[in-house]
Swiss-Prot record:
Annotated binding of NAD(+), by residue: D34, S35, E36, Y37, D38, S83, L84, E112, R135, E169, K285, K309
Cofactor: Mg(2+); Mn(2+)
Binding positions for Zn(2+) per the UniProt entry: C403, C406, C421, C426
Gene: ligA
Entry's family note: Belongs to the NAD-dependent DNA ligase family. LigA subfamily.
Protein name: DNA ligase
Transmembrane regions listed in the UniProt entry: none
BRCT domain: residues covered: 589-667
SUPFAM superfamilies: BRCT domain, DNA ligase/mRNA capping enzyme, catalytic domain, Nucleic acid-binding proteins, RuvA domain 2-like
Pfam families (UniProt xref): BRCT, DNA_ligase_aden, DNA_ligase_OB, DNA_ligase_ZBD, HHH_2
Protein species of origin: Bacillus licheniformis (strain ATCC 14580 / DSM 13 / JCM 2505 / CCUG 7422 / NBRC 12200 / NCIMB 9375 / NCTC 10341 / NRRL NRS-1264 / Gibson 46)
Molecular function per GO: DNA binding; DNA ligase (NAD+) activity; metal ion binding
Length: 667
């Protein structure tokens, strides 16, 4: 076939295959038999092989799986992919409703299924799917584009040429899971514990052809730029996603009172067992986007949504032993070793016992019959003992007086429940501290997980965090399961971590009571490690959210000579000790136009993102709110501004366009 004719036919085939694909996988209403679909796909692949330049990224042929990858690249999300706060009972839902109504008044809620899968983001440029990523830590995920292309419900080209980031939950249907596990058992392979693990494992395959065989599915539930799309509610946003050709879950309801929400939750709960996919709860969202913006976010989750989690499944098994582990702060934690038992779809052999007091309070003994559940359907825990089933063979358990790792005396610090090893040279504490230092929310050194750290420690190659930056290629390549490529990738990752902003280093150091949020607050305030090291307790407690306990821990930490020596060594090795994030509002912000003003952003900005505009205005002393009122000083209106612009005009509030905003920001 000649080139022009081939081009026209390829375009026709794209349109036909995409249409049939949408009918079959999204509408569940096919208009042609499978044989016709297969014939068209075969013709398209043949034409693309004959004319390789006609193969485009949005071609339906690209769903079969591309080349094998060496590793997953990191991807920065346009806006954070936060997790949701949890509700476990009716009272939790009522508390959520009270908080929402106190903040914004009357509301409507959108109630949706919480799909039990893997949260993903889908990036489209001019209507074409260009990148897909996992949630990761909420800010940065992993690029799994080629694997996501194998999910036939993800349109490779939308029905409109928009540039947006769509959020959804990829999952494995129950039937696909059963067939996959049946095939794995027949091949003498370990079956997956549950559909969620199977979906996550499939999407993290370096070979997309494996993912293509797994018959994954997806429901999408939001657009990162939803408020720029001219829609005003979450429910309108879902309808808009339907119009664009995405698959949304139609098991959703709107309601205006918490009583209605609770009724709907109970109704939807009864459908769980009969669904063709797994759900692990119900999501309740404030429907109005204006009210969502007004409610805002905590560090971890939106204030305008909550996930009702189903009551955990409980089972009975035998407690065989109690194992002790020493954490990075020296706390000794007991863990129950159980006779293997299935709980919520996974085999459980270990469960948390938290501390000595809990063991005594519940009178837990070795060989007891115990009730086990998964807290929040994730972490197994021992609920209680079936005392009536005791046979007399059970044995009492007593916590040791010495550290199980180093033999030092264990102490209980006043006001705490945990027994602690206070030996700073305890090998378990050092090892756990190293694992924490390289973790995702700390220095984020990809490829340097628990297994490699344990090997390095066992081979006497690392004794503290500074030693990680002295590792050589020769040392790493000799470790188990470390080839040339993985060694080079790890060295690159270690080198890259030197450029991290100060808050990651602070969190990674594992200072008592200093979590990721406090580390960010301290880094923003003091801006350099040198200033923080010299801060007095009085200066520390002046910082927002830093209390006496944190201040004391920081002063004690930075008084230690060995710590100061370690920090100096890290600096000499090239590790950054300066805050690189957005600066707190500078003193000169008081001279800016925005200082002290209440400002509303609405519509789509073309020269900068809404998040960037918000950050810059706040850095100059402005306060961004989600709704227009008499207290609003300024409305900045982009394209498709909608009701907020109309309300601003009604109230005679000053309105700027994007050009005026950029002009003011440049001053």
């Amino acid at each position: 076939m000649e080139k022009e004719a081939a081009k026209r036919r390829v375009e026709q085939l794209h349109a036909l295959i995409n249409k049939y694909n949408y009918e079959y996988h999204t509408l569940d209403d096919p208009s042609v038999p499978d044989s016709e679909y297969d014939k068209l796909m075969k013709e398209l692949i043949a034409l693309e092989e004959e004319h390789p330049d006609l193969k485009t990224p949005d071609s339906p042929s690209q769903r079969v799986g591309g080349a094998v990858l060496d590793a997953f690249q990191k991807v920065q999300h346009k806006t954070p992919m936060l997790s949701l706060g949890n509700a476990f009972n009716e009272e939790d839902l009522r508390d959520f409703d009270r908080r929402v109504r106190q903040a914004v008044g009357d509301v409507e809620y959108n109630v949706e299924f919480k799909i039990d899968g893997l949260a993903v983001s889908l990036r489209y440029e001019n209507g074409v799917f260009v990148r897909g990523a996992t949630r990761g830590d909420g800010t940065t995920g992993e690029d799994i584009t080629e694997n996501l292309k194998t999910i036939r419900n993800i349109p490779l080209r939308m029905k409109r040429d928009l540039s947006i980031e769509v959020r959804g939950e990829a999952f494995m249907p129950k039937r696909s899971f059963e067939l996959l596990n049946k095939a794995r058992i027949e091949r003498d392979e370990e079956p997956f514990a549950n559909p969620r693990n199977a979906a996550a494992g499939s999407l993290r395959q370096l070979d997309p052809k494996i993912a293509a065989k797994r018959n994954l599915d997806i429901f999408v539930y939001s657009i990162a730029e939803l408020d720029e799309m001219g829609v005003e509610t979450q429910s309108q946003g879902l309808d808009f996603l339907d119009e664009l050709g995405f698959k949304t879950n139609h098991e959703r309801k709107k309601c205006s009172t918490i009583e209605e929400v609770i009724e709907i939750v109970e109704e939807l709960k009864t459908k769980r067992a009969d669904l063709p996919y797994e759900i692990d709860g119900i999501v309740i969202k404030v429907d109005s986007l204006d009210q969502q913006e007004e409610l805002g976010f905590t560090a971890k989750s939106p204030r305008w949504a909550i996930a009702y989690k189903f009551p955990a499944e409980e089972v009975v098994t035998t407690l065989l032993d109690i194992e002790l582990s020493v954490g990075r702060t020296g706390a000794v934690t007991p863990t129950a070793i159980l006779e293997p038992v299935k709980v919520a779809g996974t085999t459980v052999q270990r469960a948390s016992l938290h501390n000595e007091d809990l063991i005594k309070e519940k009178d837990i003994r070795l060989l007891d019959k115990v009730v086990v559940k998964k807290a929040g359907d994730i972490i197994p825990e021992v609920v209680n003992v079936l005392v009536e089933q005791r046979t007399g063979k059970e044995k009492e358990f007593n916590m040791p007086k010495e550290c199980p790792e180093c033999g030092s005396e264990l102490v209980r610090i006043e006001g705490e429940v945990a027994l602690r090893c206070i030996n700073p040279e305890c090998p378990a504490q050092i090892r756990e501290g190293l694992i924490h230092f390289v973790s995702r929310n700390a220095m984020n050194i990809d490829g340097l997980g628990e297994r490699v750290i344990t090997q390095l420690f066992r081979e006497d190659l690392v004794h503290n965090v500074a030693d990680l930056y002295k590792l050589t290629r020769e040392q790493l390549i000799n470790l188990e399961r470390m080839g040339e490529k993985s060694t080079d990738n790890l060295l690159n990752s270690i080198e890259k971590s030197k450029k991290n902003s100060l808050e990651r280093l602070l969190f990674g150091l594992g200072i008592r009571f200093i979590g990721a949020k406090a580390a960010k607050t301290l880094a923003m305030h003091f801006e350099t490690l040198d200033k923080l090291k010299k801060a007095t307790k009085e200066e520390l407690i002046e910082v927002d959210e830093i209390g006496d306990k944190m201040a004391d821990a920081l002063v004690t930490y930075f008084e230690k000579e060995e710590i100061l020596k370690l920090l100096d060594e890290l600096e000499e090795l090239g590790v950054n000790t300066v805050y690189k994030g957005p600066k707190k509002a500078a003193a000169e912000a008081s001279d800016s136009y925005f200082a002290g003003k209440t400002i509303v952003l609405t519509g789509k900005l073309s020269e900068m993102s809404r998040n960037d505009a918000k950050a810059e205005i706040e850095a100059l002393g402005g306060k961004i709110t989600g709704s227009v009122s008499k207290k609003t000083d300024l409305v900045i209106a982009g394209e498709a501004a909608g009701s907020k612009l109309a309300k601003a005009e009604d109230l005679n509030i000053e309105v700027w366009d994007e050009a005026r905003l950029i002009s003011e920001l440049k001053k």
